[in-house]
């Protein structure tokens, strides 16, 4: 008998949601909303995912009494295709969506590229944010020393590698073929046009800008993240006031998907202390 090399976590049944496409004037964005009277937690997806990528977090947040909200940015599953020549501003799109949903203040949980836009939103509309959870994100920081670290980490050919190699840990890919297939299916559905659309930020994000943020902040990454390894997470945390940080074992750039039980425990513990 071959010993088990991974203990897979099945994707749980999803909580009931209200789905819709919000007409925000300049664009239309797909969203789902578990509703209820709990504090809103808004999930900002990675560049390879969409609103549908939070399959492990949606039911966990709803079961814990939160109003979980996911949405797809322009160009992603269910939302307007978007125009590469005018991709819009992600902070303004999110602001319009929260107004549409009647959300006065939210906890933002953002993965990877979603972290760029969560930070930009917190800088642009600080009163609308209660807390920030930023996961495995480069944060869009433009400081030259920080950019140089990224260039050392990821040589030019890195962008040509398969997305699962870039984003999922070797341990996960080796041990969980069903999970890998599920991740591929979510990625394939996330970008119907096949090309990612990258919206603008309101601010040129720098460490000096991050140091002005005073929201309670949780930072997480995987120990095998090729974008944001633990040493880079420590660098980020040093520039964020009072930031709490955790490194998740046997996870890469998608710890919320690779190690959902650990991720959800850390997230819910953080939210429960606010």
How should each PLM-predicted stretch be described?
Residues 27-80:
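Conserved HGGG/HGGXW glycine-rich cap/lid loop of the alpha/beta-hydrolase fold
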Residues 89-106:
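Conserved acidic catalytic loop of the alpha/beta-hydrolase fold
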Residues 243-274:
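Catalytic active-site module of serine/aspartate enzymes centered on a nucleophile-bearing elbow/loop
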């Amino acid at each position: 008998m071959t010993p088990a090399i991974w203990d897979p976590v099945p994707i749980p049944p999803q909580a009931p949601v209200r789905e819709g496409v919000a007409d925000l004037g300049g664009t239309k964005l797909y969203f789902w909303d578990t509703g209820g009277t709990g504090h809103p937690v808004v999930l900002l997806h990675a560049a390879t995912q969409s609103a549908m990528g939070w399959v492990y977090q949606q039911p966990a947040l709803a079961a814990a009494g939160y109003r979980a909200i996911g949405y797809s940015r322009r160009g992603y599953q269910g939302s307007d295709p978007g125009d590469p020549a005018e991709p819009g501003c992600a902070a303004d799109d999110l602001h319009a969506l929260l107004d549409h949903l009647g959300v006065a203040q939210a906890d933002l949980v953002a993965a990877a590229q979603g972290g760029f836009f969560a930070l930009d939103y917190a800088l642009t509309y600080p009163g609308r944010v209660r807390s920030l959870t930023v996961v495995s994100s480069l944060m869009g920081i433009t400081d030259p020393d920080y950019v140089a670290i990224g260039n050392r980490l990821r040589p030019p050919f890195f962008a040509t590698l398969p997305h699962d190699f870039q984003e999922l840990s070797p341990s996960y890919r080796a041990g969980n073929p069903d999970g890998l297939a599920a991740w591929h299916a979510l990625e394939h559905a996330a970008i119907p046009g096949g090309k990612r659309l990258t919206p603008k930020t309101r601010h040129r994000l720098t460490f000096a800008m991050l140091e002005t943020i005073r929201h309670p902040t949780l930072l997480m990454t995987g120990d095998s993240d090729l974008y944001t390894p633990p040493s880079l997470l420590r660098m980020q945390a040093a520039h964020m006031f009072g930031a709490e940080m955790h490194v998740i074992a046997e996870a890469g750039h998608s710890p919320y998907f690779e190690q959902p039980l650990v991720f959800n425990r850390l997230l819910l513990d953080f939210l429960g202390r606010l």
